[in-house]
Each structure stands twice: as C-alpha cells, then as structure tokens.
Amino acid sequence: MKKRLVAIVMGCMLALTAVGCGADKNAQTAVESTESNAAESAETETTSDSNTEAETEENAEDSTDETADADDTSSSDVTTDRSGNAITLPENVENIISMSPSTTRILIDLGLADNIVACDTYSFASYGTELTEDIPQFDMMTPDQEQIIALGADIIFTTGMSASHGTDVFEAVRESGACVADIPSSASLKDIEDDITFIGECVGKSAEADAIVADMQQKIEELAEIGRSIPEEEKKTVLFELFTPSADNPIIYTAGNGTYINEMLEIIGAKNVAASETDQWPALSEESAVASNPDVILTADMYTPDVINTILTMSGWENVNAVKNAEVYQLSSDAVNQPNHHVIDAMIEMATSIYPEKYESVALDDAA
C-alpha cells in the first residue's frame, strides 16, 4: 500500500514540477490532495616533463593509476549542476545523499548503493531493500537541513521537485558549504541521458554511466527502427494517464507535448491524444478524454485497486475504442514516472502492449 501511495504522489509531483513554479492551480491542488490522502491512508590532467624513457614510463604508469583511482571516487571537470548553478566537487566523493528516486536508482545501478548515507522518503519506499538498513530519510519538500548538514555528505543530489513551491528548501545546506547538485525534472530522453552522464561525472563513475547511456541509446534505436516501419494509417492513438479519474477527482493528468513520455510514444509509432496540448502535463476532463476516443489507454496508476477493470467499467467510457476492445494496460509506475534509464523498461511495456505482434522480438529482460 505504501508504494502505491508513493506512486500516485510522485505522479502528481512530476506533473507539477515539469511545468515549473508557475504550474496551474489544479495540478498543485492534486498534489496537495494526494499527499493528504496518503497521510490519511497510512541525491590536473597529469603530464610528465621527464627527459628519460624510464622516467616517462614510470610517470605514465603513475598517471594511469591515479586516473583509475580518481574514476572510482571523484571528477574534476564538473563546475555547474544540471540547473546551471555553480558547484565545487570535493576531491573525493564517498558519502552521498540522494533526494530523488530517479537519482537514487541511477546511483544504485552505478554500484553506489552502499555510498548513499541518506535519501528522500520516496527513494526509500521504492528502493529501501537495496539501500543500507535504517539510513536517515528526509521529506523531499521540507527536508531537515540541520540534520543533512550534520551528516557531512560529500555531495547532495536534489531535484526540481523540491523547489516546486518556489522556495529553495536546501538554502541552508548550500550556505554551509556542502556540495548541492540540483537535477531538474527531465523533459526529454536526451535530458535523461545527460543526467546520467552528469551523475557519473560527479561520483567518479563516468565509464559506468557512459555504458548505461550507450545501452539506453541502443535500445531506443531498436524500438525506433520498428516504430518507423509502422504505416501512418496503422498508428494507434493512445491516452496515457498518471492516475484514474474518480467521482472525487474527475480530472485526468496526462503527458502532453514536450515530455519524454510523449517522445517515447512517438518513437514506438503511436499517437498521443494529448500531443497537441499546450501544457506539458495537461489536466483533461473526462469529457475531453472520452471525446479523444483513444485506441489504447496506458495507465501508470498503481493506487486504484483492480485499475484495469475499473477503467473498463467506468460509466460513460463504454464507447471508447480502448474500452470496447479491452486495450487498457498498466505500466510500471516507477519505470515511467522516474526519469532515468529505466524509462526504457516503460517504453518496451508501451510498445509490446500497443503493438504486440510488431514488437514480439523485443524482450523486457533486455531493457536498461
């Protein structure tokens, strides 16, 4: 139940932060309402000037060893974070605080689970079994800055979600001299790739990060090749929903143009019914969603019990193609909502659900 509540809160927050501090009031209301419901229910180049061959070889070996050691613990070239803020990385990065589930997942996959000394509550809800037991957890929106400072981490990775209300909730941490590296919510697959590269550079895992990005790019191209082969007239229309409308909240939050979810749908040869919306994360009325008559409905809702049947039996939706043909599919909420390389898992889920025959050669086990 806790992970389901986390999933819906994260979905709301993703929609809110992607459009920045000026997000519409409906999105903010949805976040606050969801958080309330959740409460109720329970991040020199070395050279040698030696003139002798022996000294040159020795220095070259030393340089190689130092480079290898440095790649394990730190990076020297990063001067700004992903938000453009100037940062100074410590010489060695050993202890890390991650305040975003997407970053936490990347760090774990870089082999740094044991280096994470604290995280946000959502990270622990999703990945607690892979982290050190009983590590401190902080609220993403109102973190205990004094305790974070006291932990003395080498780097703190933060997210744009924490600044969605227009306040720098890590101001005191920055002023303490700690290295705070902010990573805004990614809007594209390229953004996600750049985030992974940035994190790898910060923690001395550039080679490993590059390998993750290369694998991600390879998978995207494999899917894109199939997507390009689908004739325009055979492309299915798709409604993606973050969570299912209800009597209490009849609004459908979906992914519009300028989002990596819309990008993924286009790559696999599908048509997003919300692609023409001006907002990145538009709020659709049920009437508008029904009128779009999607061929397929994809839901990231991990909260509504028996969500597929709930959608298939919603009053007023019986004439929607996706409902008539039982083309309603549930995606992994963590995979689709957390902007890291595992969005490829969600992309494969999308592709094999929408076009099972065309993507039958693509295995989810081969995903990033």
Listing of model-derived features with the role each one plays in the protein:
Residues 191-201, 210, 214, 221, ...:
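Structured C-terminal subdomain patch of bacterial secreted/periplasmic proteins
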Residues 90-93, 100-107, 113, 145, ...:
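Extracytoplasmic/secreted envelope proteins and their assembly/folding machinery
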Residues 121-125, 251-281:
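Alpha-helical, coiled-coil/dimerization segments enriched in small aliphatic residues
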Residues 3-10, 20-104, 206-240, 293, ...:
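Bacterial Sec-exported substrate-binding components of ABC uptake systems
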Residues 95-151, 155-162, 270-273, 301:
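A short, structured surface patch at a secondary-structure boundary
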Residues 164-168, 184-198, 231-260, 305:
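Extracytoplasmic ligand-binding site segments that recognize negatively charged/polar headgroups
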Residues 81-84, 135-146, 277-286:
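Short helix-initiation/N-cap motifs at beta->coil->alpha
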Residues 160-161, 242, 277, 300-304, ...:
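Short secondary-structure boundary segments
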